[in-house]
């Protein structure tokens, strides 16, 4: 383990304890139209807000990529239609009607863990560890910390 502000657990693993099979964190959809080699519009995801599946995964259930998993780089919603951008283009081309299961993603920050998953008790990071700005601060005569003995 490393001491870092972000969580080092994988979303849904034994340390994280989020159930990714819960319908709140999982959606089923189909490709409507391919916008680029790794970006497509999808049906079936109307109940999820933009960003819900960012950093999540897509498991292909039909088409040439059936049985493969791909990571989601971004999830947008435009005029009620979901747009998914994958981290990498799948091995085989995506075509309209390819079906998939998509699972929520996590930003690895304590705020996401609390608001999106209500799972702060299982957060595996150190959110209060000082950042680089604490190392770069120095005492000044006019500031609250002038360098005198406390």
Task: Indicate residue ranges for each PLM-predicted region.
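Interface-prone segments of viral and bacterial extracellular assemblies
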Residues: 1-150
């Amino acid at each position: 383990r490393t001491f870092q502000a972000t969580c080092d657990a994988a979303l849904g693993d034994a340390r994280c304890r989020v159930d990714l099979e819960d319908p709140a964190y999982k959606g089923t959809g189909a490709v409507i139209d391919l916008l680029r080699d790794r970006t497509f519009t999808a049906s079936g995801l109307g109940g999820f807000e933009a960003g819900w599946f960012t950093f999540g995964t897509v498991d292909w259930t039909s088409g040439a990529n059936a049985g493969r998993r791909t990571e989601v780089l971004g999830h947008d919603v435009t005029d009620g239609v979901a747009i998914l951008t994958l981290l990498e283009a799948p091995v085989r081309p995506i075509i309209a009607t390819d079906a998939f299961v998509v699972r929520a993603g996590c930003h690895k920050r304590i705020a996401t863990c609390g608001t999106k998953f209500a799972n702060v008790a299982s957060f595996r990071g150190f959110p209060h560890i000082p950042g680089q700005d604490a190392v770069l601060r120095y005492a000044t005569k006019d500031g609250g910390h002038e360098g005198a003995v406390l």
